[in-house]
Structures are given as C-alpha cells and as structure tokens.
C-alpha cells in the first residue's frame, strides 16, 4: 500500500482536478433544465478564439457545414457587404502568394458546393506541385524518423488508453466509458432503478471501491481492479498511484485530467453541479465530487491497460509507449494509419497481415513502398481541389504558374482561413439580422397619460411571449410588458404534497425565503393551520399514490396511459383529468410568520414528537396521556424545569429509564433547546417581510416603466409547457424560474402587489396604484398557446363583470397565436382557421407520439431592452427576448445594470445553448429523442449507456435533417443615450467582457440623438440611420 498522502499532495490532487474540470460547464438535472453556454468557462477569451479551443476540448464542430450557409445566402439571410468586408480584412493576414488574389480565392471557396476541407490533412506541398504538373510520385526513400514527431504529438494529445487504441485498435477507451457509466448509474440513481449501489452514504469512491472489490464481473473480465485498490486508501491516493503507474509526471496532470474529464463531459458537468448544490437532497445523502469521478476512471483505465499488456503486449506506461514509437517507428506509422482509417483501401489488408506477423523489417519494407503512394494520393486529391477552386476564382493560369514554395504558401493560407470561415458566415448572417431589426424598430411614442388600457400584462421576456403579446395588443386595448419570468422575486417553494424545496429563480441565485403552498381552507390563525405547518416542516414526505393502490392497478393505469395518450390523446387527456384526484384550492404563505405563530408551531410539533416517543419507546398510547404530562415532559426536555416526571408515579417507569427517555427526546426526537432555535431559524425563512415585498414590487414596476396609468387588470403572466412523454419538458418551462413553470412566481408577485400595506408604502415612494387595480396571476402555456387565469376566487366582486371580456380577448389571442405557430410545426397546417389551429395545438401537447409539441426558443436572436413602443408595430416572429425598460426612470443606471447582469446574460446562455446544439447536435446537443432513455431520474442518455446528453434534442433545432434554428449570437439592443449606456456597460464588468469579446452583439439606440442606432463592431460604435417615427396610434377606452 502506498504511503498516506500528506496534506500538500492531497490538496494538489484536488486543486488540479478542480481546475481541470472547470472547463466543463455545470449540467443541472433534467427535471429543471437550465440553459447554459457549453463554452461558458471559456468566456474570458474572445469568441473566435474560444470556439477554436472548444472544438479541440469537446471534439466538436463549432459552425455548420458550408452548404447550410449557402442556402441561407440564397434566401437573403446573409449580408453580402459583411462577407466582402470580412474576407478583405482577413485576407491581409494570409501569406502573400504570387498571382493569388486572396479575396477572389476565398469568395470562390465559400461558393463551392461541397463541405470538404480546403486542405487535405497530411498533404505535402511538393506532392501537390508534382500532381499539378502531372509528375509521377517521388521515388525518394521514406525517412521514418521524420514521420515520428507528428505521430508522437497526436498520441501525446490522447489519454493513455486512447493512445493504445490508436495504435492497436483495442477499443479500451470505449470499454472504459461503458464500465464507468454503469458505476455512475448505480451510484447516482434517484430511486428509478430497483438496485442501487450499497454504502452510497460514504461517498462515490468509497462505495464504488467496496462494490468493485467483490464484483465477479471484473474477475470474469480478467480485470485486476482489486489489486489496484489494495494500494490506495481514498480517491486522492488512487489518482496519485495510477498516474505514477502510468508514468505521467505531475507537470502533465492538468492537461491529462482535462482530457479525461471532457471525454464524458455530461457526467462531469452533472457531478460538478451536484457537488456545488448544497441544498440538493441526493447530494446531501450520497456525496460525490470530481476527484471521485476522476479516480474511478483512472483506476478502471489502469486495469484495462494492465489486462491489455498481459494479453496483447501493449504498453501501460507513457514512457514505454514513447519507446515503442521510437524503436518500432515504421510499425507504429502503419498501425496508426490502419486504425485511424487514413489508409488506401487496397492496402488495408496487406498492412494488417504484415502487422500481425510482428516483423519489424517487413513493416519497414512495406512502409517504403506504401508511403509514397499514400502521399501521392493526398497530393492528387489536393491538386484536384485546387484546380476546382482556381477555376471558380478564374485563376487557373495563376495556379499553373506557382512554384513549389508558392504552393506551400497557398496551402498555408487556406489552412489559416479554414477555422475562420464559419465565423465569417456567422458575422454576415448577424449583419443581415441587424439590418433587418433596424428596419423594424421605430422611434417610440408614449401613450397619452390619461388613456387607461382595459388591461395590462406582464409577460416573461421569453421569445415565445412575443407572438401572443403582439396578438393580444391587436385584439383590444391591451398594454404588455416584458420582465424576467420570476418577476424579480427569488422563491424557495414547498408545493402542496411535495417533499422537498424547489428554487424558482435563475440558477445562479439561491433564494433566502421559503413560500409554502397550503389548502385554502386552512386559517393561519387556527390550530389546524399550526398543526399542518408543523407536520410539513418536520416530516417532508411526498405522497405519490395512496397506500391502498396496488402495483397491479398502477400498471393497468399506465397501460391505459400508453394506449390513450398515443391513439386518442385529446379525448383521453380530458377523461384522465376527470378521474384524477383534484388538487384543492390553495393559498401561498407569502408573509413572514409572527413570533407567536412560530412559537406555536414549534410547541405543537414538539408535543406531537413527545406523543410519538411515548408510543415508540415506552409503548404508552395517546389516550392514556393527558396534556399535563406532555407539557411536563416538554419543559424538562427543554431544561426549563427539573424532574422527576409523572411517568414514574402514573406509569411506573423506573428512574433510569425515565432519564434515558428524556435524553432520547432531546437527541432523537428534537425536543431540545438548541434544536428549537434551529427550527426557529427555519421558520424565519418562511415568507417575506413587508420591506422585502415593497422592494420587490417597486423594483419590478420601476424597471418596466409601469409607474402610472394602471389598468383595472394587471395580469402577471408566468409561462410553462405541458407535454407528455417528454424528458425535456422542463426545457420548455421558464429558465428564469430555474427550469420550472412561472406560475408560482406570478402568484407570489400578484399577492404582494395586491396587499394594501405594500401599496401604501409604494404611494409614499411615488407609485400610486388605484384601488380598483387588481394584479391577477396567469400562466401562458406555450405548448397550447392558452393563457390560464389563477386565484380567481380572490377576484373582487366588482371585477367579475369585466372577466368575460378579458377571457374573450385572451382566447382570441391564443387562437391567433396558434394559427401563426402551427404551420411552423406542421407545414400542412397553413390552411387551418385559428380555432382549428388551437385544437391542433392542444392535441399535440398531450400526444405521446409527438416528439416536437413546439419549437421552444428556436429562432431566438434578439434581446431588446427598451420600451414596448419600439417594437409594438413589428412582427418579430418569436425571435426576440423583449425586456421592458424606460431609461427615464433610471437616472443612476442601476436598473439597467440589473437587466444586463440578469436577463441579458441568461438570454446569452439560452442563445448559445441553441447555437451550439444546432452546429453539432451529436456532441453539443443531445441527438434524437427517438433514442433517449431517462437515466436515474436526473438525466437522459442515448441508448442504454452513453454520456449524459446535455444540450437540446435534434427535434428542437433541426427539421428533416436541416437546421431550423439559425445559429447567431445574441444581438442585444438597448434604448438609452449612448454615453449613459456606455457608463453602465463600463460598470458591469461581466457584460462588458461579453460585448468586447464578441459573445454578445450590442446596439444602442440613442433617444437624445434622434433615435440614432449605434452598432458595436470591431471594437467601436458605428452610426446608422436614425429610426423612423410610427404612425399615430389610436387609443380606445
């Protein structure tokens, strides 16, 4: 066994592993899908540099194939001027080549109809020159030593199992993936599987080690994992032992760890998040961190290397591998060619036969004959590509005149431009999108201050709100606003019947306050309320099914679900809702508890625990105990008085047993002074103080510019999706609410805003809300386009006469939105009437066979921070996050700071989640839903074993194999004076970095300069033509 690690070495292992893993972004559980930029940990770099680093890190492509951009160019979605500007600018950095007009050649390259690389990998300029001249292949002897540095570099960039695979085709890395994924599933399972790894409470590595030592499957597989584990004590020592056994020095650990942890980046991201989520129940019960993950993979990798060394003679140390390459160079070159697929088809069998004989001289002879033919073939392929390119550039004569050294310059220039081409296309698409936006926005006009809209509505900034806002405004006298869907109120929520707290706020925020959902029949001032709340706080159990429902009955019901939701989804859904138990009308406990209420709750809870303890420990039933004995036991347990108790005189309990019972009350049942203080702290989280409520409502209303002319109805509209058989259902919910429905936050905010005490304080702060204004929570169901109203039983009677008019308008907006949305899902739906389109939307939402009930946020490209009047006359086709903001209400820029650091940054995460899920759906997205399996109730895998799929499914961003989402970076438009916006950006370091680094494209529309737009491009603000003023709008009562 190795010596125990000292503190310094232990910290070095942990710190190196943590730094290596930080390149992988967090991955949240699927039930709360959180959009994130897959390259978020590279945001300190300029975007164009980051995508190159990301391509190498995740082995993914960062831009689409050329053909997709060419199609969009034909459709007018690519700005030609930007193409010319970018090609011209980048041509200046390419090596000068006689007779080569780089802009002309690059334009020709971007117009070629295929997507293959412009330069063939591994080609030599002299072979290309010979092929262009029609000369035969070189007869010069192959210098094997000259081929080895590149081979060694390629092998060094891999982990040791991957390097062995590259030379021997052993498949160790794939087998290693399967082995560790099985272990991860057994440990991280959240009660989905019938079997879970024992001993999980000790931590991942400890539990895995114990199970693996007894795993017969490992013995049958001839993996001596137990022998390795006998040499280590914990995860840190395992890492050190394996790295030493593989001959990898500490200076190489950071790069090696990064390669190990990014191979299954979904699992790495999940473990990183889980280890940081202190509130997460499963992490509290069964801890795991990135060092555990790393150690398991290293130990299993070493076991596979040892097994391969015993049976195949492959090396198991990095230095041994290097020695093999140097000593058996010709053999290794041939091995790499064969197993990488970079081999002439006619020679593959011949190479394989020679390698199987293991004769070094034969390998050397074969390489001397094969390698010139291989290089000649590459030269011929490259020459053909250059001739095609030269013909397109009308430069055939220039190509024919190139000397060998000029051919090398041409190839180098094409190599240099290759990773830039996707960026050029993206910039040109963004340029066209910016031009399009600036033709749609108009100089805003404020509505007359004395004209009161029939209703106002606060919607989430989500792009799916744009169509229904537009239609609602056009069916009647409605005014809409955009605000982050948690309405600025972070909510910790304990729902009715739920067993754990959920967070309804952006993922980067941890709520301080807890809101309870309780049946409306409970009165906060009576004993039933106190008793129920005490039970909720003590024993947070989730009742899924009543105990008397048999497994067989559940199975039959599920069978009915599968049948009904697939063959007759809409009718079945209605029937199922009728037989399901109705959730009672509920209220949210939003106000802080008084000290008297908190004391009463704890007192009731402690009395209940004493009764339970009497029954469990002393077999004394409740009916034999009066309240005096319970009160006496409680006082003694809390050390407020001394014994003895009536347990001795009434029940004959011996003194020693009585003492033991009192100790158990304190230590086991929580009837203790210290635990009472802890419970008081927990109860202190419940609800919001009046000051907090005033602050939240004031900030939200001021931020969106709703400070006067309040309507009779102010709808607070959260949003969420309702689908069936969809592991990605939470991806359709509100990102600002932590991947959950926004109705909880809407109800909380409305309850605050309707409170008389809050309004009284707001009036003193300059915001007077009329007595007849009622804030009403609602839910925009994005999969059905419906807007559902909540808490109608609280609606003042005088508002009931207007309710039907409101509902009619909402229904009309829903039908019009469905008629706009359905043809995007199903082209054959173009001819549907609005009412038919709405019925179709409802059917798709409950159809188990439907893999795409909506497009989600596909098409998002704009983030508009300003008054709604900028865009209210524009059809933005669901492409814009609309954030209401009035700079005139924000003299110090604090509100704009909050918008930039919150919603704009979250919008950028969402935007880049869609961007990268589109450009490489297999690596950065999650592939097709058809092959998805829910794993452990926290993630999705492709098939039975794979990396956790972290991005968006193919059906969300692709249609019929082509991109539906058009990948562009977020274009953020701010309505504010340029100098004012500039000062705010300077203060918000994170957003300033994103703008300067090109992660966000910025536009400022300056109302003090005649609404002149300024576009940030290449490090400076470029002026554009001022906006036009809209036609005069009529306002009806």
Curated annotation (Swiss-Prot):
Family the UniProt entry places it in: Belongs to the inorganic carbon transporter (TC 9.A.2) DabA family.
Keyword Chaperone: no
The gene coding this protein: dabA2
Protein name (database record): Probable inorganic carbon transporter subunit DabA 2
GO cellular component: plasma membrane
Membrane-traversing stretches: none
Quaternary structure, from the entry: Forms a complex with DabB.
Molecular-function annotations in GO: zinc ion binding
Cellular location(s): Cell inner membrane
Membrane topology: Peripheral membrane protein
Pfam families recorded: DabA (PF10070)
